[in-house]
């Protein structure tokens, strides 16, 4: 009987990526298969997030539920990873004796050894260190799960915004070597992946080493990835305004694989609040980036992050944020009420905006952006959109579901042979959370560019060392 693994994941897309790597790692090295049922698992892993309020209490509530499973099954192994694990360390074990493993985002690759130590009789293993890029060297080859894939290009953040825990929980910025990223994407393309989303806490700070000890910028990386045959759509998340340089904007002008959609967090439209947040830019600088982007790519849509009720946020500060929203005309946002994160500089500021005021401002902001998003959706009616077909429609399995460049779900009638491929559809109707399309043409009628075959990369340049680590080595 195969061993079973259950992973519960909270938080950002990076955590989702990390959890998928944990599953691949334990499958390859330990033979574990994933299960959605915690009661039948041999190993339970909780991948935590410390961004939201009461993150620690949420963790201990979950561990309390899992303790009852361990009481019935003493050999059950329970592990806690992610940002709360990185923050709290051994304090988790002191409060929850049922926990066997505590590991940070940079040490998840050591899970097989940690599990072996517990099996050998060790009472607890705690490793929340920051071993830089070693994590990526030890992970198994990627496995495609559908036509779209996330690829981590860097870890950590060095910006130290006053409200954010990321530099303390994931460490400072560390970029993966260019060749490793290209090889991973080529391997995914060989498995049928058509869309890649480059992932990091601050992707546009990417500065990866090349095989000849030069430095590859983020703009250069985008062009390298776009040239790989089969990768016909390219996204990235998340970026920071202060490093959204002109060379990145230039890629939008000449690289059609890069989608006409950008998530660029701003957090506030008030210069005073931006200064308090230590964001390193003013509202006018943010608007300048968007203006230059729209000159390079007129149809680009923008989404952002907003924190509502930051300490000291006055009615005028909030009005400045709403003015920025009106000026930019955002298509989407992730917006939250401010709550202090322990250990951050902002936690020492007086939280002087009432909860009722925060809720009212949040509702106003979200309503405005929802209206703007619906307007953009209605403007798409009658247009032909290229979508990547992800699978059957959720509500009607006899239909298909795909996604536009600007991340809208489109349902349409079509043949299942189109799953995993691009099709063109005409948008004929708009709903709250999706669009309705009519099939126009399939991929065989498109003139998709072919530059660099993935097999040329994986076959010619792949080198594997004695430890089984594969690297991309240009000849």
Curated annotation (Swiss-Prot):
Pfam family, one: TRAM
Transferase listed as a keyword: yes
InterPro entries linked: Elp3/MiaA/NifB-like_rSAM, Methylthiotransferase, Methylthiotransferase_CS, Methylthiotransferase_N, Methylthiotransferase_N_sf, MiaB_methiolase, rSAM, rSAM_horseshoe
Binding site for [4Fe-4S] cluster 2: 157, 161, 164
PROSITE patterns: MTTASE_N, MTTASE_RADICAL, RADICAL_SAM, TRAM
EC number, as in UniProt: 2.8.4.3
Subcellular location: Cytoplasm
Key word Phosphoprotein present: no
Keywords on record: 4Fe-4S, Cytoplasm, Iron, Iron-sulfur, Metal-binding, S-adenosyl-L-methionine, Transferase, tRNA processing
Listed cofactors: [4Fe-4S] cluster
Catalytic activity: N(6)-dimethylallyladenosine(37) in tRNA + (sulfur carrier)-SH + AH2 + 2 S-adenosyl-L-methionine = 2-methylsulfanyl-N(6)-dimethylallyladenosine(37) in tRNA + (sulfur carrier)-H + 5'-deoxyadenosine + L-methionine + A + S-adenosyl-L-homocysteine + 2 H(+)
Record text on cofactor binding: Binds 2 [4Fe-4S] clusters. One cluster is coordinated with 3 cysteines and an exchangeable S-adenosyl-L-methionine.
All residue ranges annotated as the TRAM domain in the record: 378-441
Domain Radical SAM core, first and last residues per copy: 143-375
Top-level EC class: transferase
Recorded GO MF terms: 4 iron, 4 sulfur cluster binding; metal ion binding; N6-isopentenyladenosine methylthiotransferase activity
Similarity field: Belongs to the methylthiotransferase family. MiaB subfamily.
Quaternary data: Monomer.
PANTHER family: CDK5 REGULATORY SUBUNIT-ASSOCIATED PROTEIN 1, MITOCHONDRIAL TRNA METHYLTHIOTRANSFERASE CDK5RAP1
Job description of the protein: Catalyzes the methylthiolation of N6-(dimethylallyl)adenosine (i(6)A), leading to the formation of 2-methylthio-N6-(dimethylallyl)adenosine (ms(2)i(6)A) at position 37 in tRNAs that read codons beginning with uridine.
Protein name in UniProt: tRNA-2-methylthio-N(6)-dimethylallyladenosine synthase
Source organism (scientific name): Shewanella halifaxensis (strain HAW-EB4)
Source taxonomy: Bacteria, Pseudomonadati, Pseudomonadota, Gammaproteobacteria, Alteromonadales
